[in-house]
Amino acid sequence: MRSRVPLQILLYAAVIRSLKVVSKRGSVDGCTDWSVDYLRYRVLLGEPVRIKCALFYGYIRANYTHAQSAGLSLMWYRSATHTDHEEPITLDGTRTLKEEDALWFRPAQLQDSGHYSCVLRNSSYCMKVSMALTVAENSSGLCYNSKMRRLEKAELSKSKDILCPDIQDYTPAGSEPHVTWYKECRPKQWRSSIIRTADLLSIRDVREDDIGNYTCEIQFGRFLVRRTTELTVTAPLTDKPPKILQPPEHKLSVMELQLGGPVNLTCRAFFGYSGDVSPLIYWMKGEKFIEDLDETRIRESEIKMVREHLGEQEVSVSLTIDSLQEEDLGNYSCYVENGHGRRHAIIQLSRRELMYTVELAGGLGAILLMLIFLVSLYKCYRIELMLFYRNHFGSEDVDGENKDYDAYVSYTKVDPDQWSQETREEEHFALEILPDMLEKHYGYKLFIPDRDLIPTGTYIEDVARCVDQSKRLIIVMTPNYVVRRGWSIFELETRLRNMLVSGEIKVILIECSDLRGIMNYQEVEALKHTIKLLTVIRWPGPGSSKPNSRFWKQLQYEMPFRRPEPKLSHEQVLDASEQGPFGELQTVSALSMVSATSTAMATAHPDLRSGFHNTYNTQLRQKHYYRGYEYDIPSSGTLPPLATMGSQHTYCNIPMSLLNGQRPPGQPAHGQQQSLEEQQVNNALLPLLPRETSISSVIW
């Protein structure tokens, strides 16, 4: 019994002497605290885990058996963090249990995460250390937690071994573990160059498609234990210095720049794979680093990653000069280096003398191109541009203010028995389309002989008078017009011929079809050379009936400019009670109506003539919105005897009873009304005088 006590004392002393100091955190209540051990336990939810007391694996030179023989006790405590209050662990013997110097969780749960301290002590000695445990769930849709993977790197075309780590606690001693390997959580048909032995996966020739996550799985009782390794593949380690891509490495680059302008220099380089070493690239001016220069105008940018593949990198760095000065001129060098060497490229900045040759040529070229563009635009859209200018900034024709009509329309009617499809279209154009468009759409006032001419003298004199009162002469040139020589009337009358030759009136010649094969066409060409102010416009056909067609724009351009007149109010138009005996002749022009009325009233009764003349002439002068006329009817005298009207032409369908100043039989007395139907029954047609039948009026 006496020999046993000294033996225990010697064993206890040996244990105490075998303690080694690693990194003491401190001593609290006489217990040496080694803080948290570097080995951290990380396990997935539902997997078993064994936490071993680190005191026996690096802090003391004794194992659990020796410590227990020396009378030291091992106790376990848990805390949420290392600084929190520690509490004793309740061991249930089933899920949580103690096994010699280790603590088992079968399986681990999320609430088991924390710090576990093992304390080795007796009445006179105390030492402890903490181990961290993390329990986590699998990432969504995966068989591992992405934060618990081991990282491994492999070089392209070389071999690599992937170990299934930390599985010795789950393998019986003396036996090899049975490991199943997965890639990206799925079974894989491994190629022949990949060999599996026990807990090792060996890749003999690493390829780029070997990049991925490798999971090893072993069976431990009723539990599964998984370990995942992320493999990244890199290019082989380089043994060469970086390569400068821009500017050229073996050539001096000269840049001629103007002073005062900004400058930006860029250096690009290629770095082979050098492990975890960052690329080194920078600018220097002469022998000085850019950051050592006193100028704030000159600065260097951060290194920019252009691209990266398998660890090989292409990077760039920029040098910026806000405003180039004389002292900034010189050599700027871009340097690149790694563990195998350094290279550089030089850019020389020099001042550029001002040369205006290129600038002058460019300016003249731009002006020439602009001039060509404007000329082409004017050629293509001359009429549209002139109409736009005239409508917005033009003024009305002052020289034509004393003329009553904007245009006189000359046209040859076609006999109905000679009509064809072409002549019908020409007749429709001349009688309907042309007047309607010019009068109703554009607001022009036309003189159309068949509609507006009432004879006051010979036919030629009437035509000359009406043409003289018009600003333009529109000749609708049709084959029938050429055959009948419709222009002869303008050659027979001296006044008309002088107007055409002297340019007193502008002529608009509208060709409705091809006239070159028509008889008398040579005379048409001679007529064109005779007219001083002539514009020839071709009518394309019914397809150009829209107002925005080229034909109507050109015709509007040749017509005199006039601004749209405001619509007449009710007071400006004669009502039925104020229109007098000519109320039903609203389509007859004022000038023609006055002439016809004066001729008719000359043969009427003197009293009737006097009363009607005074009343109607006053009303016409005051209320008609075109113009007023003063016309004195002779107190005596008669018109020449009227001849019987032939079947050639009717100037205007005017009741003879009104033109002669007579009342039809049975008409009420003065001041009384007669129905329109009764008046029309007794209407007669105005016959032509003998002198007016000398020239056919088929041609207007």
Curated annotation (Swiss-Prot):
GO terms for biological process: cell surface receptor signaling pathway; negative regulation of exocytosis; neuron remodeling; synapse organization. It is a single-pass type I membrane protein. The active site is at E491. It catalyses: NAD(+) + H2O = ADP-D-ribose + nicotinamide + H(+). Residues 32-134, 143-232, 242-350 form the Ig-like C2-type domain. GO terms for molecular function: NAD+ nucleosidase activity, cyclic ADP-ribose generating. Residues 379-700 are cytoplasmic. GO terms for cellular component: axon terminus; cell surface; cytoplasm; neuronal cell body; plasma membrane. Residues 403-559 form the TIR domain. Glycans are attached at N63, N122, N138, N213, N264, N331. PROSITE patterns: IG_LIKE, TIR. The keyword Transport does not apply. Residues 1-18 form the signal peptide. It is an enzyme of class 3 (hydrolase). Disulfide bonds join C53-C118, C164-C216, C267-C334. Belongs to the interleukin-1 receptor family. This is Interleukin-1 receptor accessory protein-like 1-B. It comes from Danio rerio (Zebrafish).
